[in-house]
Amino acid sequence: MRFHALSLPHTVTTKEYCACAFTQKVLKLCAMLHRRGHTVYHYGHKDSIVECTEIVHVTDNELLKEAYGTYDWKKDFFKHNNADLAHQTFYKRAIVEVGKRKQKGDFLLCFWGQKPVADAHPDLIAVEPGIGCFNRTFAPFNVFESYAVMNCVYGIMENKNPAWYDCVIPNYFDPTDFEYREKKGDYLLFLGRLITNKGVSIVVDIAVRTGMKLIIAGQGDYRSIMGGQEPPPNVEVVGYADVAKRRELLAGARALIQPTYYNEPFGGCVVEANMSGTPVITSDWGAFPETVVHGTTGYRCRTMDHFIWAAKNIDTIKPKACRDWAMANYSMDRVVLMYEEFFSMLQDVSKGKGFYEIHQDRTNIDWLVKYRPSSFPANERVVWPIASVPSPAAPKGAPVGPVEPTTARNLEPLKPLEVEDDGFLGEVKMRA
């Protein structure tokens, strides 16, 4: 398969921009698809560091400075507007560069609502991947990062009949970015933008009521959202956390607390914490009912009483259950298989009979299986060994791409295990 990935006009596609979930989606999906042997063109900033076939330059620091001036995005929030100079220039340049490289049947991945580029290339298969905003969609095919955001967007659009070729595929994470640690420190952690809707005041209240140490990390100004108040003695505000600091904070925390007020589209920090073996405490709406296994990988709460109990009893959650859950369901190795199934479905629409295309060689429809910690063998870590799963688009015998081995892949083969689907069909048997 061939992909044209349009990055964000206002950021640089590197790991350094870890505070922007959308930038990280571009970075990782390009790598995931490229490792599987697909052709991937990345369109974005010339300083981007992306694993792909070609990095196509359509923006640079000079353009960003002209559009936004000089500001510290690590301290303040990202500046962006679809009508600004950076976005409009990105669109114009991307339209030209995509035109130089496209072939019939290619996919155009619009991560940031790049409708003008899609409109200029109607012969490409336009997809909005990883939708995580409550805005109307424009592409004929859409991937939502949670059922929560999909249903909310359908409601906004007054769409009572969902599209067969829209789907939900969760966000994906690189396990090598996180350190699994069973021995935890003495602090609770809040990680995210310092805005009212993220529930910063609730986190501080929990710390005050329990006397536990709390570390707050993220973009924004603490005092501006807390009425000018200084943090309590047991609360430390450390500002933006880069890749290394993020890794250390997540690995050492007793728990990550994310009591968001609003309908969280995904909440990636929850998965990052679980990959570090750290349990989570969240509100009970948005994507959290999909990502937090209550009582197993953390707790979901509705009242301050719930939050206090969860904080005091968080040590009952096993780090290994958190890690296994995140690795089995949200690692890059796992999620790329979901994307490949989705893109193969779209190829059927483009080249075949669409909904009625029957694949006689199909052996499973496991792409939507969700693996539960309670089903894991006690002494084994569960991952998806990507190197052993061929791409549906690759000819027989073709290599799957340059996949570096990891500790997880070098484990002994997994035994048969019981897994649950998403809860609608009960338990099913699957051989790993």
Predicted regions and their residues:
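Acidic, proline-/serine-/threonine-rich low-complexity intrinsically disordered repeat tracts
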Residues: 387-421
